[in-house]
Amino acid sequence: MNIYIPVGISGSGKSTYQKKHLPNIKTICPDDLRKKLTGDCSNMSMNDDVWMIAYDELSTCTVKNKDVYFSSTNLSTKAIQRIFDTVYGYAKNKNNIHFKILLMKDSENEELCRSRVKADLDNHIDRSNTLKLVDDLEGNTLDYDYIHKQHEEFLVIEKDIYAWRTKIVEDFDFADISITEIGS
C-alpha cells in the first residue's frame, strides 16, 4: 500500500503531479471536501468536518489496503505525523505500507506559484483562493497573501522533514518512508 503525501504551497504542482503520474489512485483532497460541504473550496467554516471526513476516508482506504494520494499542503511535520498515525492505527499489515513524501520544490519559487494560482483563478478553475491577504485575527490585514505565509512554512518543513523521517524510522523499525524532490 502506497500513501503519497505531497508537501507544497498552493500552485506548486501537487494536483498536476497527481493527474499526470497517479491518475488512477484514490485522492483525498480537503479542498474538494470543502466544495462538497459548503459549495466553495475556499470556505473554511466547516473545516473541522472536512478534516474528520478526510481522515475517515484515509482510515477506510487503509483498512482496504488501497493506495492514497493525500492532496493537501501538508506544510508541517504535525500534519504528516497525523497521516502516519492514522494509517498505522488502521493498518492490518504495517510492513506493507510505503509512505512516499513528495517535496514539491516549486514551492521555493513564491512568484511562480502565485502566478499559477492567479492564472487558474483568471481561467475560472475552481481552486482555493490563496491570493487573499492574510488577516492576523486581531482585525489587521497583513501586507502579504497566504502564498507568502505558505512559502515561509515550506522553507521550515523543507529542513525539518528529513529529521522527522529519521526519528520515525528509528522509533518504528517497520516504517518505510521515502522523500522525493519533485520539480525545480
Residue ranges and their predicted role:
Residues 36, 75-125:
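ATP-dependent NMP and nucleoside kinases share a basic, alpha-helical "lid"
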Residues 46-98:
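Glycine-rich phosphate-binding loop used to anchor ATP phosphates in small-molecule kinases
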Residues 1-4, 64-66:
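Pre-Walker A (Motif I) flank of P-loop NTPase domains
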Residues 2-7, 12-15, 24-26, 94, ...:
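Conserved GTP-binding G-domain of TRAFAC-class P-loop NTPases and closely related GTPase folds
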